[in-house]
């Protein structure tokens, strides 16, 4: 069969890989061939439902995209996930957009406990950004579910863009598409104003949302961050790494040589130190299980996919082995499993954090 291309974005049409560029279901392809209008699923949803979905990029495409952003005189809006800051930082962004103003947007602010003040989170995000070599002109917290937060975000964008175009960038799974959909609703409510154009040298489209003064907001495709937990889970279990509701941190009083299993997705060992409380911040539905450190590995091997889930009994065959990261902690510190959540250590302790091979474990100043 001759190769078909999406008439929206130009990507080659394929029916195998749902996550890949140019995907369309077989039934939709057959309908498209009848009407002579073949769209990939992403463009179809954009055209008919005003709905933007994530698309996965190769590193090469990503570099081309960043070059274009860096070469333009524009405001760069960098969306990060407050729940997973380390997993949502774009490596090398400051290098590429050095001449542009960057507005840092902490998304999913409604996931953090209400007791945490916005000002504290904003300050914390600015500190983390500086550690990553970024110098944002401003930090704003938002949530696609909150209309007034979207209004605040639009006001900040207007304040800092100074008549320029705006590029929205972010990795996959930070909720960028949902946020852009909320922005479109806020600006217009009219789906016919959105157009797409091609990134130079790629088959990737950027979504164009016109502003009143003839400038545009450009939404760019989401960049894959390879060390996020999301890449190791099936669609059904993604909810554990992208909570939709306010997380309720739980504190566990642990003695040395006790272990806490995070479903079957990770593990926390308290190796040495005074008995103390450790505060776990994960999706509320993720079941945590306390046991003795001695024999914990055998316990995991026996119960993963059953008592310790996700992964379920089918998924566990494909799920990567857990790898230990030993750490000595001196004061209040978050131990983060990229894309899953974190455990706050409140005092001196020798600990080990186990995460699937390939998933990053990082320490940071406590956020809560």
Report each predicted region and the residues it spans.
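Helix-rich effector regions associated with P-loop NTPase G domains
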Residues: 1-75, 100-103, 109, 198-368
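Short acidic, S/G/P-rich loop/turn micro-motifs used as interaction or catalytic elements
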Residues: 82-86, 110-113
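Amphipathic helical hotspot of TIR/SEFIR-family domains
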Residues: 56, 60-63, 85-96
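Conserved ATPase-coupling elements of RecA-like P-loop NTPase cores
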Residues: 87-90, 114-119, 227-230
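Canonical P-loop GTPase G-domain recognition
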Residues: 103, 111-174, 185-192, 196-197
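A short alpha->loop->secondary-structure connector
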Residues: 94-101, 189
């Amino acid at each position: 069969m001759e190769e078909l291309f999406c008439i929206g974005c130009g990507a080659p049409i394929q029916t195998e890989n749902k996550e890949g560029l140019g995907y369309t279901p077989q039934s939709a392809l057959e309908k498209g061939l009848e009407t002579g209008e073949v769209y990939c699923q992403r463009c179809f949803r954009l055209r008919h439902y005003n709905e933007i979905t994530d698309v996965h990029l190769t590193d090469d495409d990503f570099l081309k995209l960043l070059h274009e952003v860096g070469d333009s005189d524009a405001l760069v809006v960098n969306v990060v996930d407050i729940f997973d800051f380390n997993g949502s930082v774009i490596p090398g962004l400051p290098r590429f957009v050095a001449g542009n103003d960057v507005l840092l947007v902490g998304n999913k602010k409604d996931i953090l406990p209400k007791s945490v003040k916005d000002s504290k989170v904003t300050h914390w995000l600015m500190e983390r950004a500086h550690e990553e070599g970024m110098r944002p002109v401003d930090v704003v917290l938002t949530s696609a579910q909150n209309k007034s937060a979207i209004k605040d975000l639009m006001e900040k964008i207007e304040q800092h863009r100074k008549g320029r175009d705006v590029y929205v960038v972010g990795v996959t799974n930070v909720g960028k598409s949902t946020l852009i959909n909320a922005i479109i609703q806020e600006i217009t409510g009219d789906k016919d104003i959105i157009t797409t154009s091609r990134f130079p040298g790629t088959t990737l489209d950027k979504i164009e949302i016109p502003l009143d003064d003839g400038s545009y907001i450009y939404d760019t495709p989401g960049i894959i961050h390879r060390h996020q937990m999301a890449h190791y889970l099936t669609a059904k279990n993604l909810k554990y790494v992208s909570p939709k509701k306010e997380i309720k941190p739980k504190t566990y009083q642990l003695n040395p040589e006790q272990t806490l299993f995070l479903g079957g997705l990770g593990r926390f060992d308290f190796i040495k130190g005074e008995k103390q409380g450790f505060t776990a911040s994960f999706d509320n539905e993720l079941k945590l299980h306390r046991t003795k450190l001695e024999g914990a590995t055998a316990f995991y091997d026996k119960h993963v996919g059953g008592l310790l889930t996700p992964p379920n009994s089918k998924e566990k065959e494909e799920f990567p082995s857990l790898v230990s990261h030993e750490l000595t902690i001196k004061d209040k510190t978050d131990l983060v499993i990229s894309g899953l959540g974190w455990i706050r250590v409140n005092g001196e302790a020798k600990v080990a954090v186990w995460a699937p091979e390939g998933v990053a474990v990082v320490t940071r100043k406590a956020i809560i």
